[in-house]
Amino acid sequence: MAISKEKKNEIIAQYARHEGDTGSVEVQVAVLTWEINHLNDHIKQHKKDHATYRGLMKKIGHRRNLLAYLRRKDVNRYRELISSLGLRR
């Protein structure tokens, strides 16, 4: 199931850097994280759904690339983001 418009707007409002910000790295990573968590729950119930698993891996790779970019450009923003999303230990 895709992310609802209301949920996506809620995530955007929480992680946006300024009004109308929908494309910053923080927003993209936050939306991807929600989608990844949702797909993880689906995969736990439907272990043989290989197409969804492939989509999950693609989203994880995209998030990894965005986080690597953010870490190169601004370490402080990277650290704030991963702590707020609870991605690393």
Curated annotation (Swiss-Prot):
InterPro entries: Ribosomal_uS15 (IPR000589), Ribosomal_uS15_bac-type (IPR005290), uS15_NS1_RNA-bd_sf (IPR009068). Coiled coil: none annotated. SMART domains: Ribosomal_S15. One of its GO terms (biological process) is translation. Keywords: Ribonucleoprotein, Ribosomal protein, RNA-binding, rRNA-binding. Pfam families: Ribosomal_S15 (PF00312). Transmembrane segments: none annotated. SUPFAM superfamilies: S15/NS1 RNA-binding domain. GO terms for cellular component: cytosolic small ribosomal subunit. GO terms for molecular function: rRNA binding; structural constituent of ribosome. Belongs to the universal ribosomal protein uS15 family. One of the primary rRNA binding proteins, it binds directly to 16S rRNA where it helps nucleate assembly of the platform of the 30S subunit by binding and bridging several RNA helices of the 16S rRNA. Forms an intersubunit bridge (bridge B4) with the 23S rRNA of the 50S subunit in the ribosome. PANTHER family: RIBOSOMAL PROTEIN S15, BACTERIAL AND ORGANELLAR (PTHR23321), SMALL RIBOSOMAL SUBUNIT PROTEIN US15M (PTHR23321:SF26). HAMAP family: Ribosomal_uS15_B (MF_01343_B). Part of the 30S ribosomal subunit. Forms a bridge to the 50S subunit in the 70S ribosome, contacting the 23S rRNA. This is Small ribosomal subunit protein uS15.
